[in-house]
Amino acid sequence: MGKCSGRCTLVAFCCLQLVAALQRQIFDFLGYQWAPILANFLHIMAVILGIFGTVQYRSRYLILYAAWLVLWVGWNAFIICFYLEVGQLSQDRDFIMTFNTSLHRSWWMENGPGCLVTPVLNSRLALEDHHVISVTGCLLDYPYIEALSSALQIFLALFGFVFACYVSKVFLEEEDSFDFIGGFDSYGYQAPQKTSHLQLQPLYTSG
């Protein structure tokens, strides 16, 4: 019962991670955020690997999944620091999320709750193929939305890491006990004896 509850809980957290990652991937595509798009894709693959390892009792896959979650927590912590401009990070100077290929910002910058977008015409700050806009009235600014999204990812990843370690430990213990009992013992297996068909012939002796 304990093993089933642990596996079921891990699968549930993996499904939540998958839904959250797909939702985030959609909004990152809309905002042309190439670095998060790549990271989200790798995360989706790792979560699918974790689900497969849980269902198929593959402890190695769960270990790989848990190792990825450590990197995932670090990435999301960096995103929080980036959008909140911790230390020397600056959104106006660093365009890490787009690999410095464009000036696009988060999709939530213009489409956040209550945001009113006003184009600024004939602005000297406008670059070629770009336009300047003014965003006002947002109930929650986009840096905080991105930070909350990353915080949710960290929360799910921490719980997923704990349950992945627990379930993989259970799987490894079961494998060890199976070996100890003799699951792979050659002496526990006896080959079926081949039956031979012999024809009896009468024996004649000379008197």
UniProtKB/Swiss-Prot annotation:
InterPro entries: Na/K-Atpase_Interacting. It is a multi-pass membrane protein. Keywords: Cell membrane, Glycoprotein, Membrane, Transmembrane, Transmembrane helix. It comes from the Eukaryota. GO terms for cellular component: plasma membrane. Pfam families: NKAIN. One of its GO terms (molecular function) is ATPase binding. Glycans are attached at residue 100. It is found in: Cell membrane. The chain crosses the membrane at residues 2-22, 35-55, 62-82, 147-167. Its main location: membrane. Detected in the brain only and specifically in neurons. Expressed in multiple regions such as cerebral cortex, thalamus, hippocampus, olfactory bulb and brainstem as well as in cerebellum with high expression in granular cell layer. Belongs to the NKAIN family. Interacts with ATP1B1 C-terminus. This is Sodium/potassium-transporting ATPase subunit beta-1-interacting protein 1. It comes from Mus musculus (Mouse).
